[in-house]
Swiss-Prot record:
The lineage of its organism: Eukaryota, Metazoa, Spiralia, Lophotrochozoa, Mollusca. Belongs to the conotoxin A superfamily. The modification Cysteine amide is found at C13. It comes from the Eukaryota. Disulfide bonds join C3-C9, C4-C13. This is Alpha-conotoxin-like Reg1f. Alpha-conotoxins act on postsynaptic membranes, they bind to the nicotinic acetylcholine receptors (nAChR) and thus inhibit them. GO terms for molecular function: acetylcholine receptor inhibitor activity; ion channel regulator activity; toxin activity.
Length: 13
């Protein structure tokens, strides 16, 4: 999985 947003990650692609 890839973090779509910068930390803190609230959305996972």
């Amino acid at each position: 999985d890839y973090c779509c947003r910068r930390p803190p990650c609230t959305l996972i692609c």
